[in-house]
Amino acid sequence: MLFLDDAKMKNFTSCFKEKDFLKFFFNRLRLNKTSRYESEFPYISLCGRERNFIRCDDTPVVFTEQLRKDDTEVLSYAHAGQVLTLPYEPHKLYMDPRNGRVYHPAAPQVGGIGLVRSKLAIELSQHFEFLAGEASPTHFQWNGERLELQNEWVNNTQRFPMNEDCK
């Protein structure tokens, strides 16, 4: 969910929900390489002359639901439904063994990684297989196929979480 930084109450009633705005905002989201506020705000969304500096607990992209779009499976992010989606790559789901969070590839301009919302991660976790003990899962059962998880992509991502539990 997207909030103003100084919002006192951060819940669904106080977040931005207008899908056209979310599309505009997230399509301009990038790593902050402006030399301004980089340590406090590692992401930026340039909206015309306005600079929106962004910080987040974990990743700026949070996948909120799994959908079908034009006969293709996609993950939607930012609670924007069909407006903001990326192709679903089930073989690239990654569960971090340190915190149990599930991640999926995102656009390179935001660091290449997005967090899977807890509710969706719980649904997906039913399909994980752990052949290496309690470490990250090694396989994923999806649509009748047993997929070997490919987690190498995580090594090439950038995350700047503000929450210590997410590091």
From Swiss-Prot:
* Any single Gene Ontology cellular-component annotation: mitochondrion
Record's PANTHER family? UPF0598 PROTEIN C8ORF82 (PTHR31449:SF3)
What are its GO biological-process terms? Answer: wound healing
Family per similarity comment: Belongs to the UPF0598 family.
Its name, as the record gives it, is UPF0598 protein CG30010
Query: Residues of the signal sequence?
Result: none
Q: Which InterPro entries match?
A: DUF4505
In terms of Pfam families, this protein maps to:
DUF4505
Q: Where are the transmembrane segments?
A: none
